[in-house]
Each structure stands twice: as C-alpha cells, then as structure tokens.
Amino acid sequence: MVNFLEKPVYKRVLLKLSGEALMGGHRSSSIDPEMVNAIAAEIKEVVNLGVSLGVVVGGGNIFRGVEANAKGMDRTSADYMGMLATVINSLALQSAFERIGIDTRVQSAIAMREIAEPFIQRKAMSHLEKRRVMIFAAGTGNPYFTTDTAAVLRAMEIKADVIMKATKVDGVYDKDPVAYSDAVMYKNITYSDVLAQNLKVMDATAISLCRDNHLPILVFNLQKPGNIVRCISGIPIGTLVGD
C-alpha cells in the first residue's frame, strides 16, 4: 500500500490505459490477470483517498484497427472491431475491481445492454457521486476516432480535473527514449508545443480538444508500482501538458 498525502490534489480524474498495459510482461497473452490485479489494487487506493475516477482503456492488446486497415481491411469495420476489443478489456477491469470490493459500472458507447449500461452522461455523473468507478468502453462509438480522443471526451463530460495517461515510459520526451539514450524528458510542456513538435502524447484531435477546453494531461509510467497514487497525490513525476 502506498500512502503519500491525506488530501489528493485532484478530486476527479480520468485515467487512460492502453490495451497493451493489460498484457504486463506476458506478451503471449492478451490480458495478464496479474497485471490487471495490480492495476485494481492501485485503483482501490485511489478510491480510498476519496477521488472520483473514470477509466478509458484501449483495445490494442486484442486488435488494432489502424494496423488492420493498413493491411487492406475496411477502416470502418476495423475501427468497430477495435471498439469491441475495448469492451472486453473493460469487463476484465470491472471483474478485477469488483473482486476486491470496488463498486464499478461499465458504460458503453455502443449499445450492448446485456453486459454494460449505455453511455448516459447524467447517469455516469450520478454513479461517480456515489463513489463508483466508471469504466467507459467502446471509444466514442464512431470510427476514425481514437480511444485517446474518447478519453478526452469522457473527461470533459464528467468534469474531470485532469486526464492521466498511463504509458511505458516516465513522461514526454523530445524523441523516442527507447531508441535514443540522449532523449530529454519534459517536466512541463504546452499543448501547442506537443502539436508543433509532433510528440506522440496523444493524437492531434485529442490534444486539440484538451487545449481548447484547458484540460491538463499528466503522462506517467504505469510500470512503476504506486505511480497512479503518486500522480493523484501531487508527487512530481511524469510530464504535465497544459496551457
């Protein structure tokens, strides 16, 4: 258990997870139960701090629509398949959360009432006020939009203070830190600089939406245990993208 501050610096947060994050170190499996359980344990600490939390997860561990389109698949069909992959991941997270006592609801942008509620903004807000964790599935429900853009939309709709983007590296760098040992990490950077330098934080649509609505983005390393709680507690890690 990680305890930093009694009062978190953010009251409502949208956490964006990649689908690949659920794979953990087991690249032979789409979903690693140990990794999902580790994420759930950190989420419980966040809930115990009194933070209101929404989650958007990608589907790239199961299916990547952009890659399928590049190989000849119709883009609309490929994107819908990717959206369905996010539903699978959302249900995996819900199961892990509820197993350790986190009251959770999944809302889907594509109607599938047998397994998830439809996305209704007022209902999502009501769940959050009752201290339920919200998992938003199926992206925006429309092709040609990424799950990063979906995360920004949901963050604005639930009036989140910040969108926390979980990654495999410590923050935003001037170039790929995996390929270049001299890559420099930014502590703070503006939306406009991210767009001008074509830094791979989120797609341009998502970054522009954040800029237009003054929604800060905190980019951090999910692979370091305790980092979700550190971010919410105001510990200076990662990169903050803002005005």
UniProtKB/Swiss-Prot annotation:
Q: Which InterPro entries match?
A: AceGlu_kinase-like_sf (IPR036393), Asp/Glu/Uridylate_kinase (IPR001048), Uridylate_kinase (IPR011817), Uridylate_kinase_bac (IPR015963)
GO MF term set:
ATP binding; UMP kinase activity
GO terms under cellular component: cytoplasm
Please state the protein's primary subcellular location: cytoplasm
Q: Which UniProt keywords apply?
A: ATP-binding, Cytoplasm, Kinase, Nucleotide-binding, Pyrimidine biosynthesis, Transferase
What the record says about activity regulation is:
Inhibited by UTP.
The catalytic activity of this protein is classed by the Enzyme Commission as 2.7.4.22
Q: Which reaction is this enzyme known to catalyze?
A: UMP + ATP = UDP + ADP
Enzyme class label: transferase
- Which Pfam families would you find in this protein's record? AA_kinase
In which residues is UMP bound? G59, D79, T140, G141, N142, P143, Y144, F145, T146, T147
Does the entry feature the keyword Ubl conjugation, yes or no? Answer: no
Tell me where in or outside the cell this protein is found: Cytoplasm
Show the disulfide pairing: none
Transferase found in the keyword field? yes
UniProt pathway? Pyrimidine metabolism; CTP biosynthesis via de novo pathway; UDP from UMP (UMPK route): step 1/1
Among PANTHER family, the record links this protein to:
URIDYLATE KINASE, URIDYLATE KINASE PUMPKIN, CHLOROPLASTIC
Its biological purpose is as follows: Catalyzes the reversible phosphorylation of UMP to UDP.
Family of the protein in this entry: Belongs to the UMP kinase family.
* Assembly: Homohexamer.
The protein's name: Uridylate kinase
Protein encoded by which gene: pyrH
